[in-house]
Structures are given as C-alpha cells and as structure tokens.
Amino acid sequence: MPTQSVDSVKAVRVRPFSQREKNSGSKCVISMHSRTTTTTQDPKNPEHVKTFTFDLAYWSHNGFQRDKDGVLISADPSRKFAGQRDVFHDLGRGILDSAWQGYNATLLAYGQTGSGKSYSMIGFGCKQGIIPTVCEELFRAIENQGRNQEHQVMFSMLEIYKEIIRDLLSRTKKPGGLRIREDQQLGFYVEGLKSVPCENYAQIERLMEQGTKIRTTASTNMNASSSRSHLVITIQFKQVFLDRDLTKQSSINLVDLARSERQKSSGSEGDRLREGSCVNLSLTNLGSVISVLADAAMGKKVLHIPYRDSVLTKLLQSALGGNSRTALVAAVSPADICYEETLSTLRYAERERKIRNRAVANTWTLMRKSRAENSKLLPMMTFPHLLNLSEDPQLTRVLKYFIQAGTQPAPCPRPALSPPHPALRISDKHASFTNADGKVTVTPHSKCKVAVNGVPITTRTKLQHLDRLILGSNSTYLYVGFPSEWGSEDLSRFDYDFFQLERAAAEGASADKLGAADGGDGKAGPSVLAAFQDYIKLMPLVSEANQMSEEPKKGLNMELKVKNLASSDSRGYDLQKEVLVKVTHHGSHEVWIWSKAKFINRKFLMQELYQRFLDGDHGPVARDDDPFWDPVEVVRLGSAHIWLQSLAYCMKLEEQVEFLNCDGLEEAVLHTCIAPCSPTGQTHGEEDVVIDPLELLGKRMDFQIHIVRCLGVNWMKEDAKRGTQIGYRIYDLPNTIYTKPVWKSVNPQIEETVQFAALTASQEFLNYLRTNALIVDLWGLQEGCTELSCSQLGLMVTGEGHILVDTKKISTVKDISQAASNQIPELYLKLLKLEQETEPLRNINRALREENVLLKASLAKTASGQAPKPSNTLKISGMTAQLPSAGEMSQMCTQQAGSDRELAKALKVFYQSMNTARGQLFRLRRHQPPEVDQMLRPFIHQRSQMFKDLGDLRESSLWTLKMTLLL
C-alpha cells in the first residue's frame, strides 16, 4: 500500500510552451528554486517578483527526453523535471491510500484553459495522467486482496454549468438540469444521477471515453463550454470484510474546476456579469467553505459553513467537511503573455489551499449498447470517416463519423432542431456526403455554410485524404480517406489552431496584413503576432455571434477590425496592434466598437439568450438584459497626422490631410491651418521666420490652430442623419479640444480657431514641435448619442484668454534616431539625417550674420580711420571660411541686408516640401497589400513607385535648399 496520506496537499505544475506561445515569441516568467517554491516575474516590470510556497512544485517546462515507450523522463537525473509518474507518486498514491483507509478523498485541478490540467489529470496515449492511473492501480490492488473481502466500485459523472447539473452518462438531456436533494443520512445528492458499477479498469476506461464524447457533443453545439463548466467524477468505493463484519465506505471526488474569470481583464467590469459571475460563484463559495473549515480546524469559532450557497459546495460537503483528504493541482503556463492568468491561479491556489480535477464514467445500459455498437462498427473501419476537432485537446478526435456507400447526411451531434439554422445549428439537412466509385464528395444544402481547407464551397466538392472541413460556424472535422490512402501521417498536427490559421489565410487575414513590416527585418514583431493570434481566435466566435443574431432577428452584423495604436502616437511609430469588433445594426445603421474582452463576455451572454430561444422562450427581453443591445455611442472614425516642424521655425502651415481609418483607408479629408501669431492674434509674416528654433528658447510663443472644414466624410455618406466632431490635443494639454458638432453634412464647414501660448518655450517643447505631429481625431455622431463636450473648463489660460501649453517640465525627449532606430523605416531615418545635414548650413549662416555686424561697424568708422581691420578668415565649428577682401566689403554690405529674408524664404520652401514628404512617408507606411493574390504584382510596382517618388522629393528639397543658399 502507499505511504500514509496527509490531510491537505497543494501543488503547482508548470507546463512547456504551447505552439501558440512559441509563435508569439513568448518568454518564461516562472522559476522554481526548490520542490516547494515558485517564483513569478512581471514581464512589464522585471523587478516585480512574487514568490509562492506550496507543498509540491513540479517543473515540467523543459529538461526532458522520451524513453523507449515514448514517456517523458528527465534528461538529466540531476535536473528538476517532473513527469507524469512523479505527479502520480506524490498525489495519486495518497488518494488511493485515503480510499483504502475509508477516508473521503478529493483531487481538485484548477487553471486557465490550456494550462495543462487535462494532461496532468488524464494524459494522452502512453503519458497516462493521475485519473486513469488511480483507477488502474485501484483494481490492481483489489485483485491482490484476500477471499474474505468484497469490493464494489461505482462511477458517476456530471457537469455543472451556471448552477445547472447535467448527467454526462445519460444520452437524454433533462430541461433545467438535475435537482439536488438533501437527506438526513445521505446529505446532499443529485436526484436521478446514474451511478454505474464497474468490475475492472477496462470498464472504467470505456465509461470515461463515453462520457467525454457526450461532453464533446455539448460543446460542439455551443452548450456549456468545457472551459467554463465544472466537471465532477465520483468513485464510490466500498469494502466489505466478511470475517470481521466490517464495511468501509469512501468517496473519491475528482473535480475539474472551470477557469476563474477576472472581471477586469475579461471586460466584465461595468458590463453584464451574469454568466461570468455564475462561473465565479462556485469558485468563490468553494474558497469560502475551505476558509471556514480551516478556521474551525485551527480552533476558531465558526457559526456557519456556507455549503448551500452553490451547487458545487453542496455536492462536495461530505468530501470537504468530513473525513476528507484533499489535494490540489494548480496548472499554469510559463509564458509572459499569460502572466496575469498565471498570477491569478497561483494566488487562488495559495489562498484557498484546495482545487479539483476531472474524470469520466458511464451507465451499465450505455455500456451494453456500446458493445453492440462496437460489433457493428468493426466492419465499418474500411470506410472513410470524419474526426471531430475541438479547442480542448481532451475533446479532440473522440467522435468518428463513417461515410458508408451511398449518400448520407452531415454529422449531427444532437437531434436536429426545427427549423434548422443554416450555419450555427448543424442538422442532417446541412450537407450531404456521397461515397461512390471510390471517391467521397460533399454537397452543401441551400445557404448552409461549408468550408473545405478554409475555402467556402457552394457546390459538390470532391474530398481528398486529410482535407479539413468546417460545417456551419465552427464545427470542425478532419476527413480520413479510404484505408488505401492512409500513410504514416501525423494527425496530431491537424489541431484546432491549424484549422483556424488555414481559415484566416483563406479569408485574407495574415500577420502581413496586420502590419508585419513593423520589424526592420521584415518579420512580424511580437505585438503583431499576438494581435494575429487574437484575430484567429475571435474569427469563429464572431461568426457564431452573427448567426445567433440572425434567428432571433436582432439585426446585428459583427466584423473584426485591427486598430494600429500608431494612429494615436504623435511620432507615428508602429506601436501595438489591438483587435476590435465593429457591430452594426442593419435597420438603424447604428454602430458600436467593442473591445476583445467585452465581445467575449457578450458572446457568452448571447449564447445563454440563444439557448433560451431554442428552448421555446420567444418572449421579449428587457434592454438591460439583452446582450445584443447597447446605448448609442460616439464612434472614432479615423485620425490624421499634421507635422508641426514648420511651427518650430515660425512658419505658417496650411494643408489638407487624410483621416485614415483602422484599415488604413481614407475616411475623410481635413483642411486645416496652423500659424504662429502674436499675443493679440495677428499672424506672423515671412519676416518673422527664424533660422534656428533655439532662437525661441525661453521666449513667449503664440500660435493658432484653425480647423476649416472636412471633405467627403464616408460616415455621412452611409447615413445622412449622422453627425461629426473633431478633437485634438497638443503637447502637455490635459484635455482634448473638441469642435462643435455638425449634423447632416458630408462636407461639414467647421471654421473654428483656438489660440495657444507657451509663455517661456522650453527645449522639450521645441523638440516636440520639430519631431512630432498633431493628432486630429474624427468622431462620428449618431442619433441619441451624447455629444463630446466642447467646454474648455479646467484648462489654464493667459490673460487674453488663450490656452496655455508647455506649463511644466518634462523629461527631455530622446533623440528619435536613437530611441527608435530599430522601429522606424529606413526612409524615416534618412529624413532625420537630412535635418542633421542642415546644421552646418545654419552654423555658417549664424557666423556670417555675426561678421555682418562687425562689417557694418567697420564701415561706420571708416571715414574717421578708426575701424579695426577685420580678419580675413573665420572659424566656424571646426571649419575655416575665407572672408571677402576689403574692396568687396562695401558691395557685400548692400547685399547682406536682404540675405536674411531670402534665406527665410528658402527655408520656408524647404520645410514645406519636407512636410509634404513626411506626409507621403506616413501614407506609404500605412499602405496595405490587397487581399487578392492577382493584384500583388501591381501593388509591388505601385509601392516601388511611391518609394521612388519619395526619394526624388527628398533630393529635390535638399538641392533647392543648397542652391538657394549658395546663390
């Protein structure tokens, strides 16, 4: 028998990187310094380190190899790698020992989806997990017992989703779920739950497989998602000692907890929380029960144990509150992109001390049916078939649909509902498969959605071995052809992510489209890869949400958008991408923009409402309870960049710039004017142009921003009843300045001017003007929305009523060429280099002006003969410049009077042309390739021509400046 168990064991296990985490370039943020200590490091703040202490800490991230049987073992005996056998030895044997001694034993598994719970508890293939090993060892020990003992093993398996219980060993689904009853002797029990007697491990294995199939069917048809439901497997183990008239009864509870939803990260905060709160309710109440029981064990006075507060705690009352020995396995991901979820899991495990795992069982009746079905299925192994795929690896390839000779309907995981939904609900009328003449074809019916290898089909299509099929929104299957076509292919590579990547590629979504060129080497950066992973993860969810909107006639259409945060950055850098969901109402044309987290939360609420609709509840839904409804809001349509470099030289800038939306397409054209002025508002002329921005240092600087009009607003073309507003914020201004709203105009005339003043222009402010752009946002107004406030209350103003900027010291802006040398394109660096090349010209001009003053003084004193003779040479910043002879001085003085004015004009022309070049560069960087492959070659030619034009414009601007200065 195993060594004696302890009453409570808490453990944590770290898995290897998943393929998705590898693709995202994830880094490991978890370390283990001993078998009991786990340390996490915040990826955003490496100095922020948290340490957690557990009874056991298993390092399974790396340092392993495969033995001859394919089992993972430590590559080096001195290393700390923990395999499946190590976990069972520490936890599984303790569970068995408790059962033999008559104690209730509970094993709890907790962790975010994909953290490795299923691998630790059930395992795959030869890498057997805790549950099957416990069952196998239990029957092995029974076989070695004496003849004076009788043993009885009973299995039951249920699922708890939103406080509703479902028996996974029953093919029939009871409306409203099973009920919990209470008996004075038995305590809480589930009325009508099937408990199946088992005589050997093979029966348990078949029951687990059967239960998993039933659960797979449920998740395939969008009922309780496996990651958001609790799974409870109970093994009732009874020992009867005939010679001693003694009976021992123990209950082994194997519980797989749903993942806990952190409201803030999931977007539930301030939104509807019912679905998420139902999931969290069981976890919270379980933690409360455990905490109270722990207080009681320490001798504290306990008035009430809240078993009745949730379904889960009612069922586990006898296991938690009696002679139970409980073990917890917290499964976590080591990736930095999962840091928040990992930290949440570790905190829960350390605080509550207990959590659970999953298992499976089946009924005696179902087992007989399975045997009969197996005898019928054996000869069918020669037919081609479909294998199901699921996001949960444990539910993948557990359903097999054989395609026999002739024509048969598409796989229907549950009884067909009437009327069948053309995409969401898969019925036998969705599509048909025909097996004839040694080939298999699939034919979609009516408007039903069918995709083969990611490409939608509308007519009869021949299937090839290992083709990928998607029926409806997200029912995925792998086609396995005739046995003659089988080879040594590795089917494991065709996982759920493979299907979604293929689907995304077929729909034109790729890392390149999302902006992969932001890495200087042409490779997608981590932010792009992370956004792409979010994009493909949300694609099937958006498709399902659209279908759920159709049948109840909600009239919504949802589509994915990718927001480039560079559109909100005044330097125009390619920053992090963000995936959003644009929601449009067909009838009213109202538009909403939902974040990823908000959409996911709403989608689960939509699923609940849709299930009620399927159950026959077609009554009206209050707005506050309708996840398809939201208050009308203002929508951000696009942004424009207006570079402020000319303002640093006191030059007026008037131009038309494009508002670009999140797709990089033109949303409207903005006509604006930015001009330096006097405190009284009089615009400066050419004579006020400065050669060097440093001349403005410490001086008062006033300027006006005049928003003239917008042209061709697409938002207004879609619905003439809409309106627009424009907002911008400059430098350290705490609030955004908004123009007055304009309704029902495609070309809104705005004509609003705001004057700003920097009382003592700082070096930081001047650097900002030289290197940054003014971000102007275009906002769309809808009927019933709240307009953006135009009030300027709270802003600091001068005595003349002008808004103050540059009011506080900030950190000196780093040189752009150093701060973003690895982020900005080569052409942008060339523009910066061009600015640096003008510095020697400015130095020469400054020195000539100083010498001009000396020459004027000399000429004034020439008549008296007292003038000092000027030097024939002048040193300028390490260079030697030859000065004019005495005979040329008089002529030079007459020409010098207009030189400053000519230089100012030349610089004005130069910076205006460079501003055009900078705008063209920004549009070039936002230029996206077409989705159609046939247009790729014209796109490459067009982009090459744009680069050539930009280079010519840069060279022309520089040549004009140099020639003007030399004349």
UniProtKB/Swiss-Prot annotation:
Keywords, in A-Z order: ATP-binding, Coiled coil, Membrane, Mitochondrion, Motor protein, Nucleotide-binding, Transport
InterPro entries tied to this protein: FHA_dom, Kinesin-like_KIF1-typ, Kinesin_motor_dom, Kinesin_motor_dom_sf, P-loop_NTPase, SMAD_FHA_dom_sf
Residues that hold ATP according to the record: 111-118
Example GO BP: vesicle transport along microtubule
Gene3D superfamilies according to UniProt: 2.60.200.20, Kinesin motor domain (3.40.850.10)
Major subcellular location class: mitochondrion
Localization terms from the record: Mitochondrion membrane
Domain Kinesin motor: 7-355
An annotated GO cellular component: mitochondrial membrane
SUPFAM superfamilies, sorted: P-loop containing nucleoside triphosphate hydrolases, SMAD/FHA domain
Gene Ontology MF: a single term: microtubule binding
FHA domain location: 410-472
Disulfide bonds: none
Keyword flag Translocase: no
Pfam families named among the record's database cross-references: FHA, KIF1B, Kinesin
Function recorded in the entry: Microtubule-dependent motor protein required for mitochondrion morphology and transport of mitochondria in neuronal cells.
Similarity comment: family membership: Belongs to the TRAFAC class myosin-kinesin ATPase superfamily. Kinesin family.
PANTHER family with a match to the protein in the record: STAR-RELATED LIPID TRANSFER PROTEIN 9
The name this protein goes by in its record: Kinesin-like protein KIF28P
Organism listed in the record: Homo sapiens (Human)
Encoding gene per record: KIF28P
